[in-house]
């Protein structure tokens, strides 16, 4: 054991602060001043801001005390005597070397490896206040990987840079049931990470952090089971997000500000069902929010089927509004504090009273309880004459106008009887198609969308009656006053009564000429459609989209992006109402512009795919390229083209694409980032690339859809893409989780992607040209060096021959050369010649 005494050295720099003095190791804070305000008590996550400071001797201080490099005599550094009270271990040339134990002034200790007088390698450093670090040291500084242990028992294990938590690591607090695992930057939570606020793991946050603050995108699960998924700012919900209150069966999706609903959003109240029953709707509000209240303009859909659209003030209907009752009657007028101000006009349906003036009559009607009750019964539909009941009352006014007035009553009665006889089967069909592509529903009810309705029409072969789906949309749009921009929208929802109304309208449009001379005509039209189309074919799903449950769920993640592509390439229809539609010709041009039409997918194959389920496309002789395609036909055609263009599983593209969803923090650690549609993305948007690749290999056409748009360019530039990955360049490809699977989805609109890809190809071409020029220069330089070596070798051999001829060597060892580089041989031979000349 070697003990060093304290000495005052005049040569030491008095102004230099001792690098290992207690002031270099301040006490570590135990409380988190930025504890979440809403998620836990102020002491719930305090210890996560513990920031270990630099504990070791600085390298630059050591260099000041080292002697001159040219001095061969090593002297013990002066500062060591002042800093280290005692040392046990080995020394080399006066410097600590190997394993040792040192006690510093102030009570700090170190046991571990030394190198050239510095703590270097594995070791354990304990501060005077009890904080301990076990791990790697690099020149007196904790680096790479280590474990911090605080006096209260809290621990951190993970990456360390400059004595601070930096990189990936896990922190556990001993005083509170709080733990964090994720990325750190300069001692603070920064990047992707998960924090758990209780021992059971039922209260947690997983997502983005910026300097100990939840900021970005993340998921917060509360102890009650309520879940928020969306954007954060300054530790509160802020931006776009979805909140689900499982305790009260509510859900809100929309904009947030400072932790409360603010802006546009949708709030849904899910009703508890009576056993063996279903509600067709849940209560839902779609509109503006201010500080958590319904405030501004909005729509409220009641579970009964009624709807209010108008102004709101602090959760109450206030101002001008339009209230549609469940039987279809409408009140349009002012509201005050959730009540109608003016009395609704029932157009003569209200009983008249003997008062001469309408004003007096109105006042009597408003005041008399019996009249008011009767009016409300009429408004609520309790006195409906429909055989189907008020909840399924059909709107037949437009169809009945096609018949003489004397026949209208009989036509209505007979068609209602027909619906009533088939209502069980029609309800089953509605429920079946409305649930396609839906993963879950809190109240086990589903709403049919236009996308489902199109699939129903195609399965039942409505389009085989010389009418396309686009034509059907126009017929229904004209009959029901649908806005032009929503005529072909796949997201429009249909209630059961709307579904029944549409069937009757299409039945009349398709068969009315056949039964125009027979009565009841409307009943016969519906009966034929039911017997020949609906009953034999319904619920037998065809097409690429809804034929497999797993494929459907996977493909539905592309609907929004493909809808953008579809609308971008639509053109106004020549005939009224001049809505945007896509013809088969424009579809083919779009594919050609994306370089998808190739040897695998020819124009002939394109026609065959479109004509598979569309008799209007090809009659055996001619092809109809003016055929209009609705979005369902467009989307299913893309899925079919994906099978043709990408026959093999696209897993090989995974390694070729740079992952844009990986962000690098200051420490160089990589973590996934998810930006997402809060409605369509799974709560756990962070998944490993390896598991995603394995999952994607099980997909068929849906997993190939994302690379379809630029598949031909990918195949041509695959080596270039690999090179760009090695150079750190990135392409616009998102890896997002959908059912825990890997999805290739272009982050740009498809009509813009070609320009981006052209720029990327141009950049790769310039890069390859530069690399080729560099390789050429390297080859020329290498060739010149080889020629020089050959010349030296030839000269050396000639020189050896000359030496041998002039004089034989005195002894054998001098004439035998061991294999070594040519230059060394020349030097050895020249030295031997010189020595021989001196002997002479």
UniProtKB/Swiss-Prot annotation:
SMART domains, alphabetized: MORN
GO cellular component: 9+2 motile cilium; cilium; cytoplasm; cytoskeleton; sperm flagellum
Presence of the UniProt keyword Coiled coil in the record: yes
Transmembrane segments: none
Highest taxon of the lineage: Eukaryota
Cleaved signal peptide residues: none
SUPFAM superfamilies: Histone H3 K4-specific methyltransferase SET7/9 N-terminal domain
Coiled coil: 758-801
Localization: Cytoplasm, Cytoskeleton, Cilium axoneme; Cell projection, Cilium; Cell projection, Cilium, Flagellum
Keywords, alphabetical: Cell projection, Cilium, Coiled coil, Cytoplasm, Cytoskeleton, Flagellum, Repeat
InterPro entries recorded: MORN
Compositional bias (Basic and acidic residues): 1-16, 51-63
Region: Disordered, residue numbers: 1-74, 810-840
MORN repeat start and end residues: 86-108, 109-131, 132-154, 155-177, 179-201, 204-226, 227-249, 251-273, 284-306, 307-329
Subunit structure: Interacts with RSPH6A. Does not appear to be part of the axonemal radial spoke complexes 1 or 2.
Free-text function comment from the UniProt entry: May function as part of the axonemal radial spoke complex 3 (RS3). Radial spoke complexes are important for ciliary motility.
PANTHER family: RADIAL SPOKE HEAD 10 HOMOLOG B-RELATED
The protein, known as: Radial spoke head 10 homolog B
């Amino acid at each position: 054991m070697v003990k060093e005494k304290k000495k005052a050295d005049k040569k030491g720099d008095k102004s230099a602060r001792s690098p290992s003095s207690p002031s270099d190791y301040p006490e570590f804070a135990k409380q988190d001043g930025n504890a979440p305000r809403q998620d836990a008590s102020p002491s719930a996550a305090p210890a996560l801001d513990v920031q270990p400071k630099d504990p070791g001797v600085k390298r630059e201080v050591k260099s000041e005390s080292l002697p001159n490099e040219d001095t061969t005599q090593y002297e013990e550094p002066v500062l060591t005597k002042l800093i280290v009270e005692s040392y046990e271990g080995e020394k080399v040339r006066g410097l600590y070397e190997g394993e040792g134990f040192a006690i510093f002034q102030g009570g700090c200790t170190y046991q571990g490896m030394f190198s050239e007088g510095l703590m270097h390698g594995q070791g354990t450093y304990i501060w005077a206040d009890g904080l301990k670090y076990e791990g790697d040291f690099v020149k007196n500084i904790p680096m790479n990987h280590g474990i911090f242990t605080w006096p209260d028992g809290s621990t951190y294990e993970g990456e360390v840079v400059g004595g601070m938590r930096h990189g990936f690591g896990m922190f556990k607090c001993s005083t509170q049931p709080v733990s964090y695992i994720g990325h750190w930057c300069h001692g603070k939570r920064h990047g992707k990470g998960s924090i758990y606020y209780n021992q059971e793991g039922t209260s947690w946050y997983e997502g983005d952090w910026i300097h100990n603050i939840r900021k970005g995108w993340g998921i917060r699960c509360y102890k009650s089971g309520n879940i928020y998924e969306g954007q954060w700012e300054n530790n509160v919900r802020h931006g776009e997000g979805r909140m689900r209150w499982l305790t009260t069966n509510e859900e809100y999706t929309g904009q947030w500000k400072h932790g409360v609903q603010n802006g546009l959003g949708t709030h849904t109240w899910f009703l508890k069902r009576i056993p063996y029953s279903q509600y067709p709707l849940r209560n839902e509000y779609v509109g503006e929010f201010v500080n958590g209240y319904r405030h501004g303009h909005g729509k409220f859909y009641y579970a009964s089927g009624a709807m209010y659209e108008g102004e709101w003030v602090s959760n109450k209907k206030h101002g001008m509004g339009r209230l549609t009752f469940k039987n279809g009657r409408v009140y349009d007028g002012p509201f005050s504090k959730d009540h109608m101000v003016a009395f609704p006009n029932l157009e003569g349906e209200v009983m008249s009273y003997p008062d001469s003036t309408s004003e007096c009559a109105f006042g009597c009607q408003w005041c008399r309880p019996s009249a008011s009750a009767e009016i409300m019964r009429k408004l609520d539909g309790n006195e409906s004459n429909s055989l189907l009941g008020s909840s399924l009352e059909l709107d037949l006014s437009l169809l009945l106008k096609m018949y003489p007035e004397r026949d209208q009553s009989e036509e209505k009665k007979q068609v209602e009887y027909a619906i009533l006889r088939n209502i069980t089967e029609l309800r089953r069909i509605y429920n079946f198609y409305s649930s396609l592509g839906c993963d879950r529903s809190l109240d086990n009810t589903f709403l049919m969308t236009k996308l489902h309705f199109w699939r129903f029409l195609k399965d039942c072969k409505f389009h085989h009656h010389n009418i396309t789906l686009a034509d059907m949309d126009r017929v229904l749009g004209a009959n029901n006053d649908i806005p032009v921009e929503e005529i072909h929208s796949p997201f429009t929802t249909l209630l059961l009564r709307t579904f029944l109304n549409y069937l009757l309208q299409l039945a009349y449009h398709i068969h009315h000429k056949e039964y125009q001379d027979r009565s009841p005509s409307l009943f016969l039209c519906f009966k034929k459609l039911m017997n020949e189309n609906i009953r034999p074919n319904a619920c037998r799903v065809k097409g690429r989209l809804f034929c497999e449950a797993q494929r459907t769920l996977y493909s539905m993640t592309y609907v929004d992006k493909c809808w953008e592509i579809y609308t971008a390439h639509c053109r106004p229809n020549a005939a009224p109402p001049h809505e945007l539609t896509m013809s088969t010709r424009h579809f083919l041009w779009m594919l050609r512009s994306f370089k998808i039409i190739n040897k695998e997918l020819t124009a002939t194959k394109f026609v065959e795919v479109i004509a598979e389920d569309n008799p209007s496309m090809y009659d055996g002789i001619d092809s109809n390229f003016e055929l209009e395609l609705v979005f369902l036909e467009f989307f299913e055609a893309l899925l079919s083209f994906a099978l043709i263009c990408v026959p093999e599983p696209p897993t090989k593209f995974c390694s070729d694409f740079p992952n844009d969803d990986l962000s690098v923090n200051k420490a160089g650690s990589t973590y996934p980032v998810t930006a997402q549609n809060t409605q369509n993305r799974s709560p756990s948007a962070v998944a490993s690339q390896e598991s995603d690749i394995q999952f994607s290999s099980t997909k068929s056409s849906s997993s190939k859809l994302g690379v379809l748009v630029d598949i031909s360019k990918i195949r041509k530039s695959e080596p270039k893409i690999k090179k760009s990955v090695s150079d750190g360049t990135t392409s616009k490809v998102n890896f997002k989780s959908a059912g825990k699977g890997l999805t290739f989805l272009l982050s740009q609109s498809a009509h813009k992607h070609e320009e981006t890809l052209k720029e990327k190809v141009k950049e790769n071409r310039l890069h390859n040209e530069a690399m080729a020029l560099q390789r050429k220069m390297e080859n020329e330089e290498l060739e010149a060096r080889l020629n020089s070596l050959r010349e030296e070798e030839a000269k050396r051999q000639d020189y050896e021959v000359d030496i041998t001829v002039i004089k034989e060597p005195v002894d054998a060892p001098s004439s035998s050369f061991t294999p070594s580089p040519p230059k060394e041989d020349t030097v050895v031979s020249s030295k031997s010649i010189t020595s021989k000349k001196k002997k002479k």
